[in-house]
UniProtKB/Swiss-Prot annotation:
Its main location: nucleus. The lineage of its organism: Eukaryota, Fungi, Dikarya, Ascomycota, Saccharomycotina. This is Kinetochore protein NUF2. It holds the Pfam family Nuf2. Keywords: Cell cycle, Cell division, Centromere, Chromosome, Coiled coil, Kinetochore, Mitosis, Nucleus.
Length: 451
């Protein structure tokens, strides 16, 4: 298994050292792990194996040496042989241990030439296993207590057996004729083998329960992740639905109010234009009247001057009067043109601009309203045809598939596992009672035989 496929997190050096020291591995320091040596890693792995598996490499080698004897070894090769055998046994045990905790590629190089990154990865696997073991230890307390009780009873039976063996040996020393027959000894050995088989079965049951519980936990986490993803989708769809409802309920009213205000403003500006037009017409009529009066006065004066012609003084006065009248006319025209006409032109331009803006705004409003209606209709159709079926389908899927299906299935599997476990426990209790009966029967027979 490659590093990217590991089922456990790779810890940094500081956290790794803290976790290992909390597990009573005092040798674990940042300096030793960052620059590992062969002797250091061999010593640390021996402590890990002895702590988690209860196996001592030295004790295995000592027992093996006692069984095989050292006579076949030469004196100069004995130390080399023992060191090599020590590393081989440690490598085999470490390979099996790391394989059980999720590392498939442990090899001899990790003992002879350890690398910092691989060492950090292997020790991270050990910490992850220790955490999982500590978390699951509470679930296995009842099994551990039962196993300890059975082991205590088994040790008691072995002690009884050893006591009987000692008594038999004493009787053999006293009287060589009182030797148990071979059939009874063979029967006793078979019973011991049955006890060992029962112990192995209990160990396998414990491992199977741990694996089943881990699978159940993984399945539960996967279902929770699916439910979380579906919840996010539902929240997003509900948010989009609320936005569509807000657009359909709010924007049309605001547009209608805006159009109404603009229409009122247009009516007001038209009324102002009509008033100004009427004032302009009145002023034009006044100017026309003044022009008529001036023309008539000029004609009268001209007739008078042509009829009288008495003196140049009178003519000069008439010319001056005419000039004054002309000046007054020009002044009046200038006043009209520069005052009221200028204001009328400004108001006319403003009115034309407002009319153009109003017309453009009305067109834009109509176009925007049409686009909003079209978009709202499309969104409504899309919601009805796509989003709502998905929401309904999601609700049905959550209700039927996840809640009613997978969770019920997992509950059924858990109940079935509990039933199977209870059946196996009952079978073990029955076998244990039978075994106890056989041992008691054997003890009674041995006592009767010795008496």
């Amino acid at each position: 298994m490659s590093r990217n496929q590991d089922v456990f997190p790779i810890l940094d050096l500081q956290e790794l050292v803290i976790c290992l020291q909390s597990c009573d591995f005092a040798l674990a320091t940042q300096e030793n792990i960052s620059r590992p040596t062969s002797d250091y890693m061999v010593t640390l792995y021996k402590q890990i194996i002895e702590n988690f598996m209860g196996i001592s490499v030295e004790s295995l080698l000592n027992s093996s040496n006692q069984e095989t004897g050292d006579g076949h070894l030469q004196e100069e090769n004995e130390n080399i042989y023992l060191d090599t055998l020590n590393v081989l046994v440690l490598n085999k045990i470490c390979f099996k241990f790391f394989e059980n905790i999720g590392v498939q590629d442990f090899n001899m190089t990790d003992l002879y030439k350890p690398e910092a990154q691989r060492t950090q990865r292997l020790l991270s696997a050990v910490v992850n296993y220790a955490r999982f073991r500590e978390e699951r230890m509470f679930d296995c307390n009842s099994f551990i207590l039962q196993m300890e009780s059975l082991l205590g009873q088994l040790r008691s039976k072995f002690d009884d057996y050893n006591l009987i063996q000692q008594q038999l040996k004493q009787y053999e020393d006293v009287d060589g004729d009182n030797i148990p027959d071979e059939q009874e000894l063979q029967k006793l050995e078979e019973q011991n083998k049955e006890l060992e088989i029962q112990l192995k079965k209990l160990t396998k049951i414990q491992e199977t329960l741990s694996i089943d519980y881990n699978d159940y936990k993984i399945s539960k986490q996967s279902i929770f992740k699916d439910l979380e993803a579906l919840s996010f989708q539902i929240v997003e769809l509900e948010s989009n639905r609320d936005k569509l409802i807000k657009i359909s309920n709010t924007d049309m009213e605001e547009l209608s109010e805006g159009i109404k205000e603009l229409n009122d403003l247009l009516i007001q500006r038209k009324k102002t234009l009509d008033d100004l037009t009427a004032q302009q017409k009145n002023l034009q009529d006044t100017v026309t009247t003044f022009e008529t009066i001036i023309s008539e006065l000029y004609d009268v004066l001209r007739i008078i001057s042509s009829e009288v012609q008495e003196s140049n003084r009178t003519e000069t006065e008439l010319v001056g009067l005419k000039q004054n009248l002309i000046n007054n006319k020009l002044k009046l025209m200038n006043v009209l043109e520069t005052g009221i006409m200028y204001k009328l032109e400004i108001l006319q331009e403003q009115l034309d601009l407002q009319l153009k803006n109003l017309e453009k705004l009305s067109q834009d409003t109509k176009e925007e309203s049409r686009l909003n209606d079209t978009k709202l209709m499309d969104l409504q159709i899309k919601y009805e045809n796509e989003i709502k079926p998905k929401i309904d389908k999601t609700d049905i899927f959550i209700q039927e598939e996840l809640i009613s299906g997978k969770i019920n299935k997992l509950n059924d599997e858990i109940k079935q596992l509990q039933k199977d476990f209870e059946v196996e426990v009952k079978e073990i209790e029955i076998e244990y009672s039978l075994l106890s009966g056989h041992i008691n029967k054997y003890m009674n027979e041995m006592l009767e035989y010795m008496q």
